[in-house]
Structures are given as C-alpha cells and as structure tokens.
Amino acid sequence: HLCDRRQRQMCIRDRHKMIRLVTLSTINGGYLNFMGNEFGHPEWIDFPRQGNGWSYKYAHRQWDLVDRNDLKYQYLGAFDEAMIHIISQKKKFERTPIVKLCENDGDQVLAFLRDDLLFVFNFHPFKSFNGYGILAPTGEYEHILSSDDPAFGGYGLIDMKVKHLTRHDPLFEKDNKESVSYTHLTLPT
C-alpha cells in the first residue's frame, strides 16, 4: 500500500530526528556527525579500494538532496539546524547533569532534564499519548522544538504555543528539596 509506505517513511524520518536529538542532548563534550547524516543521506561513503573494485560510485555526497523541494531531506536538514542552534545557545551545556525523569519501556517513552531543558521522546512506532504524565520539577514548560512540527515534516499535532504548568502531587514532594509535579503532554507517535 502506498499509504503504508508513506507512513513507514514518516516513521523512519521521525526516528531519525529523535535519535539525533537524543544523541545531541546527551553530549558529554563533543558531537560527532558524519557527512550527509544531518539530512539523512540515503547512501554510505565508500572510497575507491580493492574491495569495491576501485569504484567511485559511493565516493561522493549528494548535497543537492537537502535543497530539493520534491524530496523530504529538507525537513531533516531543518530539524538538525534547529536542534544544534538550541543546544549551542546553552553555555557549557555538556557539563550539566542529565536527570532522568521517565524511562518507560512499555510505552517506549524517555524523558530527561538537562540544564533548563526538558526532553521528552515517544519512540513507540504506532502509539500516541494524550495527557502523558511526566514527573518534573515544578514550574512552567513551553515547547521550543518538536519533531512533529510541519517545518520539520511532521503532522503539526503539537500546539507549540501551549505552555504546560505542572500539577502538584503531594505524594512526590521530597523533604527539604525542590518539589516535583506532573506535567501532562501530548506525545504523538
């Protein structure tokens, strides 16, 4: 089915964006990127050698792919640029601790805090969540990046203007420490 194929391709692009963001947001000093990976280049690099018959076939990058409007590589390139911009604005980001907030294998949801950024990922291949509770430091959270944003090839299911206030839960209040509360989020697949 063409629809199934398109949906599978969308899922692959979304996973590509999230894996790259998880990698970047957990850096510990450096960020390694391979040529063309920033926009999901479809082929590998293989320089001429005896094992490939001294072929030049894969010894190049198709840099024009990211600029072509008839293809989807532009969305991966735009997401890559946006996520790097956000992280680069944080001074000494790599020195800030990663605080795991949620790791739910059944739901395939991962959430962690780094500096003042809350990262939430839904890796489930077909299950979206509405009102998913994440236990986080009490406060207000706003969207600054979403892999679901149409600018990055997403469906636009997240309203980027919505701010999320945490809801206090006394069961999770810690003695003499910053209180934690639930924030409820929509997590599209």
Q: Where do the model's predicted regions map?
A:
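Aromatic/acidic polysaccharide-binding cleft in carbohydrate-active enzymes
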Residues: R5-R6, L24-D70, M160
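Active-site rim elements
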Residues: Q9, R13, D64-Q74, K174-V180
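Alpha-amylase-like alpha-glycosidases and glucanotransferases acting on alpha-linked glucans and related
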Residues: R5-Q9, R13-N28, F39, F93-T96, ...
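Aromatic- and carboxylate-lined catalytic core of secreted/periplasmic carbohydrate-active enzymes
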Residues: Q62-V99
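C-terminal beta-sandwich/jelly-roll accessory domains of carbohydrate-active enzymes
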Residues: F126-P188
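Carbohydrate-binding surface patches
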Residues: L101-A136
